[in-house]
């Protein structure tokens, strides 16, 4: 098992690869045979397919991410990030508003043998997001 700092470095590397479009580099961060995403209810192949589909049909654009915290304890790494995007398509029944919205999101990864083997994520402040879309409330 890696140290908490090594585990955080692995998650940072995965996110950097994903953000830069380096799919092979991102995939190398996972144990493809053992990985399971609780958020996607899928193995690694299923998770990638769901992510591609969501990107194609994404009702938000011009997204930016601000990492507020990256914490490791044992084999778990937790990231708290603020996502800001422009609402450009229908989401939760709310037509595109053109508003800039921001919500906090949590991601949790479990690391084993220097690879990501489990993920819980996309834990978003949905009530806050809906309020921003529906009424234009913002931070």
Q: Predicted segment positions?
A:
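Short, low-complexity N-terminal intrinsically disordered segments enriched in polar/charged residues
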Residues: 1-29, 33, 137-139
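Short, positively charged
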Residues: 1-2, 82-91, 139
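Residue-level signal for nonpolar/aromatic packing positions in well-ordered secondary structure
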Residues: 11, 26-27, 79, 109, ...
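Generic beta-strand hydrophobic packing signal
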Residues: 14, 63, 68-70, 106, ...
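A solvent-exposed, acidic/Ser-Thr-rich amphipathic alpha-helical stretch
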Residues: 23-77, 81-85
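C-terminal-biased regions
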Residues: 60-64, 111, 116
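Exposed beta-sheet edge and beta->alpha loop/turn motif
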Residues: 84-113
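Low-complexity, intrinsically disordered terminal/linker segments enriched in charged
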Residues: 117-139
